[in-house]
Design a protein with these regions (language model features):
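Extracytoplasmic juxtamembrane/flexible linker immediately downstream
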Residues: 1-20, 25, 141-152
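Catalytic cores of peptidoglycan-degrading enzymes
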Residues: 51-54, 58
Length: 170
């Protein structure tokens, strides 16, 4: 990964190692409105996929868009679908590099809800992929293995609100 160090931002978070792929020339990973991975980013994703083979931890993969509204808006294909498609396209590149598909715990579309450059919401760098190498604790929380029951106060306070909303058990 040394050859790509200018394009990869690493951050330790409470949930694990966050990998943000950002081109050193500020090129986007994706064209506007497209889920096709740019050729120059495919190499980075495949190198990361190969490197993640040596890690036991599960991976969470998030796709992001800039804040520009996508074509058909609320009722049709939106930034939510586009970011999900980008995440899935990136997943395919990681798997093509030999990363086992079952290493992925989650593939999510975030739309423009978490901008890398919030001061410039239309910036191409906001169109990106985030990879989280999850801690064991984060994996357990996500997969529901470390569930803790709500305390009685929370359950009691939530019950009337849920009942008033008309929610029913399924």
């Amino acid at each position: 990964l040394a050859e790509f160090k200018a394009q990869i931002r690493l951050e330790i978070t409470p949930d694990g190692l966050q990998i943000q792929i950002v081109d050193d020339q500020n090129r986007p990973m994706f064209d506007v409105g497209s889920a096709l991975v740019k050729v120059y980013m495919r190499d980075i994703l495949r190198e990361i996929g190969s490197a993640l083979n040596g890690v036991e931890n599960k991976i969470s993969l998030d796709g992001h868009t800039d804040a520009s509204p996508y074509g058909s808006g609320e009722r049709g294909y939106s930034n939510w679908e586009l970011s999900s498609d980008r995440a899935n396209a990136s997943r395919r590149e990681l798997v093509a590099a030999g990363m086992p598909d079952d290493k992925l715990a989650r593939v999510t579309g975030m739309a423009s809800s978490y901008l890398l450059e919030p001061q410039n919401p239309l910036s191409p760098v906001n169109r990106r992929i985030s990879i989280l190498v999850m801690t064991r604790e984060a994996e357990e929380r996500l997969l529901g293995r470390a569930r803790t029951p709500l305390d009685a106060t929370t359950q009691t306070a939530a019950a009337p609100a849920i009942a008033a909303s008309g929610a029913t058990k399924r």
